[in-house]
């Protein structure tokens, strides 16, 4: 079965999707789901994205089966490294998705994307440099999510992270991930745009050239209409490049 390995329900501060609705939609689409509720320990608003993990498991364990798995999306930051690692180890997740939602102490959506003192190249380089720092430091995740996350929100004329401008640092990131046995996500949110798809093909091809073999697929759905969105285009990329889509169960890779 195909799995959407990046889905948020009402246990994430930015979603009000009910698990029952998510399950119904997944059944309709014939896809499995891994719920990846947000835990962003250093988020600027201390009341948001602080997942109550015991409550999450207490409420959702009854829904867990071969087609519905329980994971978490960890915001990888430096100040709370020890706390985040402890929470990653303490509970029996099926899957841990690692994400970069901030550049050092600046949340990307709230603050970093509003900066007007950086060129396009500087903006993306700083983000990728921080990503390199955290993937080097952290071992407590299985797949790295949406490396193109800031591209959703920036207003540059060329709104893509490209190999042409960032090949050296992307190589470093991919080599670290591969050496640690981590994989990367094809996040499908932006795969409705031909320019984005072509750019993604270049970047994922480089991941493959460096020894990457596997990817996870994630819609980053926060509502039922986005579950498994653009998966057809994602499969086109994996087939073209010879990358193998996988999902995780009990922190172990499984094949579609």
What are these regions (language model features)?
Residues 1-78, 83, 87-94, 153-164, ...:
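An N-terminally biased module of ancient metal coordination in phosphate/nucleic-acid-related enzymes
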């Amino acid at each position: 079965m195909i799995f959407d390995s990046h889905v948020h329900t009402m246990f994430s501060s930015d979603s009000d999707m009910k698990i029952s609705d998510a399950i119904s939609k997944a059944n309709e689409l014939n896809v499995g789901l891994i719920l990846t509720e947000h835990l962003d320990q250093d988020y600027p608003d201390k009341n948001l994205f602080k997942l109550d993990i015991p409550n999450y498991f207490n409420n959702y364990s009854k829904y867990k089966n071969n087609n519905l798995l329980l994971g978490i999306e960890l915001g990888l930051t430096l100040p709370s490294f020890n706390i985040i690692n402890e929470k990653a180890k303490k509970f029996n997740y099926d899957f841990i998705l690692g994400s970069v939602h901030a550049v050092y102490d600046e949340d990307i959506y709230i603050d970093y994307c509003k900066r007007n003192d950086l060129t396009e190249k500087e903006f993306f380089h700083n983000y990728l440099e921080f990503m390199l720092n955290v993937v080097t430091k952290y071992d407590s995740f299985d797949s790295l999510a949406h490396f193109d996350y800031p591209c959703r929100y920036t207003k540059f004329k060329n709104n893509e992270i490209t190999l042409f401008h960032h090949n050296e640092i992307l190589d470093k990131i991919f080599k670290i991930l591969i050496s640690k046995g981590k994989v990367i996500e094809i996040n499908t949110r932006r795969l409705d745009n031909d320019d984005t798809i072509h750019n993604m093909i270049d970047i994922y091809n480089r991941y493959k050239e460096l020894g990457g073999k596997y990817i996870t697929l994630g819609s980053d759905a926060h509502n039922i209409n986005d579950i498994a969105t653009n998966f057809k285009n994602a499969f086109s990329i994996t087939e073209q490049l010879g990358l193998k889509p996988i999902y995780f169960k009990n922190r172990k890779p499984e094949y579609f």
